Amino acid sequence: MRTADKWKDYRLVDCTCSEKLEVWKDISLIRPDPQIIWKTPKKSDLWDKAHAHYIRSSSGGGAWEYNRKIPESWQIKYDDLTFNIRPTGFKHTGLFPEQAVNWDLMRKIIENSCRPVNVLNLFAYTGGATLACAAAGASVCHVDASKGMVQWARDNAASSGLADRPVRWIVDDCEKFVRREIKRGRKYDAVIMDPPSYGRGPNQEVWKLEDCIYDLVSVCTEVL
């Protein structure tokens, strides 16, 4: 198993009882995580001093409880990439730091290819993979159903000094976009995707992983 152990601006401090304690630059956050099924004793005093704690609601969703004032957004760096972080109403911060191992792999493959590389990034979120590929010299088509997330990704690219790289920023339903790319005859050297288990497209199209993933993977083979 590869671990994301090169971070300097992010730390997973502790995790227990369906929650994790993290430090993003110098901001400490407690967030729920259903995969943390163990109930070991807490190992850090920071649990009681965290800047903010996301509290799940019994009726669904949740909200942030702030113990100390924090900025609306702040930046963290990974290697030469800069990301804008901010707590959202859905517990997320705009970045999945464990994905850094995949960014490193993508960059290595692209840099070693010794030729132009064209990448399609689906469900591209705030652009971690897009930035990694662009920084390595690839042309990238970044697709996400959320206009807000695509703008966030563009902001991350600008913060990373990559605003002038060849990236197409697309707000669209991923499968519909791929089908149109097939009709246009476009081809890519690689397709990246990290689909959610459930979501909605820009026109309220329903995405359920177990119902939709096979068709999506099948059509993606036609643009490779």
Each predicted region: which residue ranges?
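Non-catalytic substrate-recognition/targeting regions of SAM-dependent transferases
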Residues: 6-22, 29-97, 104
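Conserved SAM-binding loop of SAM-dependent methyltransferases across substrates and taxa
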Residues: 126-138
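Conserved alpha-helix/loop element of class I SAM-dependent methyltransferases that forms part
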Residues: 97-115
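Conserved class I S-adenosyl-L-methionine
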Residues: 114-125
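S-adenosyl-L-methionine
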Residues: 146-192
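Mobile active-site "lid"/loop adjacent to the S-adenosyl-L-methionine
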Residues: 147-149, 171-175, 188-219
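Helix-to-beta-strand junctions that scaffold the AdoMet/dcAdoMet cofactor pocket
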Residues: 224
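Conserved SAM-binding motif I beta-strand of class I
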Residues: 139-144
